[in-house]
C-alpha cells in the first residue's frame, strides 16, 4: 500500500496519502430504483476516464452501453454541487442486486423494484462531482472517515508469513482478469 507500490506495513499515513480529504461515510436509505438508475447514468456518463467521478460498486451488478445517450448535468456556475439533469441518460441497461432482484432491465426501471441503501462519502452524497440525484436524498452519517474505513478493511485480510495483510488468491473480487463482474461495459 505504500505510494511506492512496494509491499510493507500498512500505516494510517499510507491511507491518508491515498485518501487525504475529510470525507465521512453516510448511508442514504430508501433509494428508489429510478434514483439508482439516474445515479448510475451519471457514473456511466463519465466512464472510467479518471477523476474519481466513476462510482465504485458493491452489492449489485450493472451493465452500461457506451452507445447510449450520456446523461448531461448542467453546471452554470461551475460549482460541482450546483448541477441539474438537462439530458436524460440511456446508457444503463441492467441493474441487478446480488440476490437476483432486478432494479433495471433492458434500460427500464422494473415495476415494484425494491428500494436500496447506498453508502458513500459525504462529498458524493451531497451532490459533489455533479451527482444531483444524491443531493436531494436523506442521509444518515456514520461519523467514520472513508480513510479509516479503508485502513480497517485492509487490516481485516488474513496475514501472510511476514505478518502483512494479504488478499487470498482465491478471492475473485480482486482478480486482474475477471473481477467479480460488478460492472460490465457494452459497446
Report each predicted region and the residues it spans.
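Catalytic centers of hydrolytic enzymes
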Residues: 1-187
